[in-house]
Amino acid sequence: MASPLTRFLSLNLLLLGESIILGSGEAKPQAPELRIFPKKMDAELGQKVDLVCEVLGSVSQGCSWLFQNSSSKLPQPTFVVYMASSHNKITWDEKLNSSKLFSAMRDTNNKYVLTLNKFSKENEGYYFCSVISNSVMYFSSVVPVLQKVNSTTTKPVLRTPSPVHPTGTSQPQRPEDCRPRGSVKGTGLDFACDIYIWAPLAGICVALLLSLIITLICYHRSRKRVCKCPRPLVRQEGKPRPSEKIV
C-alpha cells in the first residue's frame, strides 16, 4: 500500500492538472468596443448637440465623457461626467461647471448620451468616451464639435453673348460708342473715338518722318567726291609735262 504522503502528493497533482485543463478551456474575456456618433459635428452658436457613446461588450463599471477645448494649449483632456452602468448615478466635474453646459443620461444599458445644452465657444472642442473593463481602460475615437463656418458664395454674373456676324460683312457701330455724354456739351466726336482716329495717323506720320531722315543720311554718306582737276602726264624720261587739252 502507498504511504499517506504519496497519496497526498498524488491528489494534489491530480487537482492541479484538472485546474490547468479547466483554465485553458475557458475563453478570455472579450474587450469592449466603443462606438461614438456622430463622427463629426458642425454646430451653430446656441444649438443643442447630442453625442452618443455605445458600449458593446461587458463593462464592470460605467462610462466617462472627456473633453479637450479647441482653444486650450494644454494637452491633457478635461473630465466632464461619469455615468454608472448599474444605477442612475451621474457625477459631474464641479470645476468645469458641467451641469450648466451639459446634461447626461444613460439611454439603455450600453448607450451613454452627453448633451451640449447650448453650443458656445466654452464647450467647443473634441469629445471622446472611456470605459474600464477588467482593470483596463478603453477609449473611443475623437469627435470634433466645432462652430459651423458659413461660406458666402457670390452668384456668377451671366453675360449675354455678342452676336456673331458673317465673314465679310461690316459690323454696325453702336450709337452709344461715339455719342457725346449727356453732361458734357461739345462738338465733334468724343475723346474715346478721337484717340482711336488720331493715334494711328500720328504713328504713320512719325514712321514717314523717320524714314525720310534715314534716307537723307544714307544718301549723304554714299556720295563720292569727284576731282575735276587734270592730272599731269609723266614723260618717259621721268619729267612731267603739261597735260594736253582734249577738244
Swiss-Prot record:
In its UniProt record, which GO terms are filed under biological process? Answer: adaptive immune response; calcium-mediated signaling; cell surface receptor signaling pathway; cytotoxic T cell differentiation; defense response to virus; positive regulation of calcium-mediated signaling; T cell activation; T cell mediated immunity
Extract the ranges annotated as region (Disordered).
Answer: 156-182
> Which of the residues are on side Extracellular?
28-196
MF (Gene Ontology): identical protein binding
Indicate the principal place this protein occupies in or around the cell: membrane
Q: How does it sit in the membrane?
A: Single-pass type I membrane protein
Q: PROSITE patterns, alphabetically?
A: IG_LIKE
Q: Which GO terms describe its cellular component?
A: cell surface; external side of plasma membrane; plasma membrane; receptor complex
Q: Which UniProt keywords apply?
A: Adaptive immunity, Cell membrane, Disulfide bond, Glycoprotein, Immunity, Immunoglobulin domain, Lipoprotein, Membrane, Palmitate, Signal, Transmembrane, Transmembrane helix
Q: Which residues lie on this side of the membrane: Cytoplasmic?
A: 218-247
A Pfam family matched by this chain, by name? V-set
Task: Answer whether the UniProt record assigns the keyword Repeat to this protein.
Answer: no
Disulfide bonds listed in the record: C53-C129
Result when mutating M105V: In strain: C.AKR
Q: Note the superkingdom of the native organism.
A: Eukaryota
Role of this protein: Integral membrane glycoprotein that plays an essential role in the immune response and serves multiple functions in responses against both external and internal offenses. In T-cells, functions primarily as a coreceptor for MHC class I molecule:peptide complex. The antigens presented by class I peptides are derived from cytosolic proteins while class II derived from extracellular proteins. Interacts simultaneously with the T-cell receptor (TCR) and the MHC class I proteins presented by antigen presenting cells (APCs). In turn, recruits the Src kinase LCK to the vicinity of the TCR-CD3 complex.
Q: Describe its partners and assembly state.
A: Forms disulfide-linked heterodimers with CD8B at the cell surface. Also forms homodimers in several cell types including NK-cells or peripheral blood T-lymphocytes. Interacts with the MHC class I HLA-A/B2M dimer. Interacts with LCK in a zinc-dependent manner.
Q: What is this protein called?
A: T-cell surface glycoprotein CD8 alpha chain
